[in-house]
C-alpha cells in the first residue's frame, strides 16, 4: 500500500490550483462574516433614539443664528447645559429676538433719541453677559455679598447697552445716565427693570437686597414700577421693598405708579 502511494505523482500545477481554490473559499467565508457583523452593527445603531442628536443640532443652530457663528456667545452653551435647581429662572433668560425683548420692555417706554430702533434694543452676542451663565451655577443661599453692586467681584452685574439704558431710565437726567451706564446697579435692578420675574424671585431667594440703591439713587422697585411690571412690584413689596420714596419720584404717566401713589396717600 505504501509503495502504491509513493508511486503516485501529484502534478505541481494541479496542486497550485487546489491551493488557490482553498484560499479563495477561505477569503469568501471571512468576507461574509465581516459583512454580517457590519450589518448587525448598523441595525443596532439604527434602533438608537435620535432626539439627543436632534436637540444638539437645534441648539447649535440657535446659537449660530444669534451671533452668526457656531461659537457660543459668553457661555450660552454652559447655561443650556446647566442642570440645577435654578432652571426655572433660566427660562426667563430671554434675549435672542427683538420680539421677546420688545414685549418685555413694554410699548410705552420713551427714548431720548428718536432714531434708536427696536432692533438696537435686542441683546447681541456682546450683550449676552447681562445674565451670565454663572447666575445659575455660582449662587448659594444667603450669598448676598455676591449679589451686591458694591462687591468688586460681582459676576452677575454688567453694564447695559446705551439704547437699553435709555429705555430702562427714560426720566433720568443725562448726567445720571452717564453715571448709571458705568455702574448700572445690582442684578436685581436689571432683572426688575427688564421684567424677568423668575430671575427676580431667584435673586431674592439667594439673598439679594430689595432696597439697594444704584448710582442714580433708585432701588429695584423704582424700575419695576417705571416699566409697569406689576407682578415684580407686588413681589418686591411682599419682600419688604421700601416703595414710598421711590414711587413718589416716578413720572406719573405710568398707570402703575399712579395706582401705587393712590395707595400711599389713602
From Swiss-Prot:
Outline what the protein does: Transcription regulator; part of the Fg3_54/C64 gene cluster that mediates the biosynthesis of the octapeptide fusaoctaxin A, a virulence factor that is required for cell-to-cell invasiveness of plant host. Positively regulates the expression the Fg3_54/C64 gene cluster.
**Which residue windows does the record flag with biased composition (Basic residues)?**
18-31
Name of the protein in its database record: Transcription regulator FGM4
- Name the Gene3D superfamilies for this protein: Ankyrin repeat-containing domain (1.25.40.20)
What InterPro entries does the annotation carry?
Ankyrin_rpt (IPR002110), Ankyrin_rpt-contain_sf (IPR036770)
Please provide, in alphabetical order, the Gene Ontology terms of the cellular component aspect for this entry. Answer: nucleus
What the record says about disrupting the gene is: Produces significantly smaller lesions and fewer spikelets with blight symptoms on susceptible wheat cultivars.
Ranges for the ANK repeats: 183-212, 216-245
Q: Region Disordered: which residues? A: 17-36
The organism named in the record is Gibberella zeae (strain ATCC MYA-4620 / CBS 123657 / FGSC 9075 / NRRL 31084 / PH-1) (Wheat head blight fungus)
Tell me which UniProt keywords the record has, alphabetically: ANK repeat, Nucleus, Repeat, Transcription, Transcription regulation
- Subcellular location(s) per record: Nucleus
Q: What induces it?
A: Expression is induced during infection of coleoptiles of wheat seedlings. The fusaoctaxin A gene cluster is silenced by H3K27 trimethylation by the histone methyltransferase KMT6.
Amino acid at each position: 500500500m505504501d509503495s502504491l502511494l509513493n508511486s503516485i505523482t501529484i502534478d505541481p500545477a494541479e496542486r497550485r490550483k487546489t491551493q488557490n481554490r482553498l484560499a479563495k473559499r477561505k477569503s469568501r467565508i471571512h468576507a461574509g462574516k465581516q459583512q454580517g457583523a457590519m450589518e448587525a452593527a448598523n441595525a443596532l445603531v439604527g434602533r438608537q433614539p435620535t432626539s439627543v442628536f436632534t436637540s444638539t443640532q437645534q441648539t447649535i443652530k440657535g446659537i449660530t443664528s444669534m451671533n452668526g457663528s457656531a461659537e457660543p456667545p459668553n457661555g450660552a452653551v454652559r447655561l443650556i447645559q446647566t442642570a440645577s435647581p435654578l432652571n426655572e429662572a433660566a427660562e426667563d433668560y430671554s434675549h435672542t429676538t427683538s420680539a421677546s425683548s420688545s414685549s418685555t420692555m413694554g410699548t410705552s417706554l420713551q427714548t431720548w433719541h428718536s432714531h434708536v430702533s427696536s432692533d438696537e434694543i435686542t441683546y447681541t452676542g456682546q450683550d449676552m453677559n447681562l445674565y451670565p451663565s454663572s447666575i445659575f451655577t455660582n449662587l448659594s443661599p444667603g450669598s448676598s455679598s455676591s449679589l451686591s453692586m458694591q462687591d468688586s467681584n460681582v459676576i452677575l452685574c454688567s453694564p447695559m447697552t446705551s439704547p437699553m439704558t435709555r429705555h430702562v431710565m427714560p426720566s433720568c437726567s443725562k448726567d445720571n445716565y452717564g453715571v448709571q451706564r458705568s455702574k448700572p446697579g445690582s442684578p436685581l435692578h436689571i432683572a426688575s427693570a427688564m421684567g424677568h420675574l423668575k430671575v427676580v424671585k431667584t435673586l431674592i431667594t439667594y439673598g439679594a437686597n430689595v432696597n439697594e440703591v444704584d448710582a442714580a439713587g433708585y432701588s429695584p422697585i423704582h424700575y419695576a414700577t417705571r416699566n409697569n411690571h406689576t407682578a415684580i412690584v407686588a413681589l418686591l413689596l411682599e419682600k419688604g421693598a421700601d416703595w414710598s420714596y421711590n414711587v413718589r419720584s416716578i413720572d406719573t404717566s405710568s398707570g402703575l405708579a399712579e395706582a401705587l401713589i393712590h395707595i400711599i396717600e389713602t
